[in-house]
From Swiss-Prot:
Function: Binds to the 23S rRNA.
The protein's name: Large ribosomal subunit protein bL9
HAMAP family xref list: Ribosomal_bL9
Cellular component GO terms held in the UniProt record: ribonucleoprotein complex; ribosome
InterPro entries linked to this entry: Ribosomal_bL9 (IPR000244), Ribosomal_bL9/RNase_H1_N (IPR009027), Ribosomal_bL9_bac/chp (IPR020594), Ribosomal_bL9_C (IPR020069), Ribosomal_bL9_C_sf (IPR036791), Ribosomal_bL9_N (IPR020070), Ribosomal_bL9_N_sf (IPR036935)
Organism, scientific name: Pelagibacter ubique (strain HTCC1062)
Molecular function in Gene Ontology: rRNA binding; structural constituent of ribosome
Amino acid sequence: MKVILLENLRRIGSIGEIIDVKRGFARNFLISNKKALYASKENIAEVEKIKSELSKKDTEKKKEAQKISEQINNKEYEIKKLSTENKELYGSVKPTEISKLILENDKLDIKPSMIQPITEIKSIGKFKVKIILHSEVDSEITINVVTADTIQ
């Protein structure tokens, strides 16, 4: 199925590009999230008209992502979790918890889908976490997991 991209997407394409993708990916992800349009003659003409406007919006999003990246890049956050004597956690640290932690500390709204732990966080220690803020901008933070004395 041919679609026209409305955003720059990593490993997929850039704004205004006509690409061929599987039908399910187009319907369930690209079109439903307003990242692409069906490649009809009318849509191609419409995208050509608004291509410069779309690239300006993308540039603004990129600048905003770079500002956020400068604020949180290489920063360390501490989270307290219950653990065993072997320093293993009861459960794990999820992206939603990391998102709430960043919101509480820096007042930045980072969606859990942007957060990608490099390794699964299931024990006490320091872990690197990658945050993808834009298709061209990402940041790395450190999560320091310490033992909690009581249940929170």
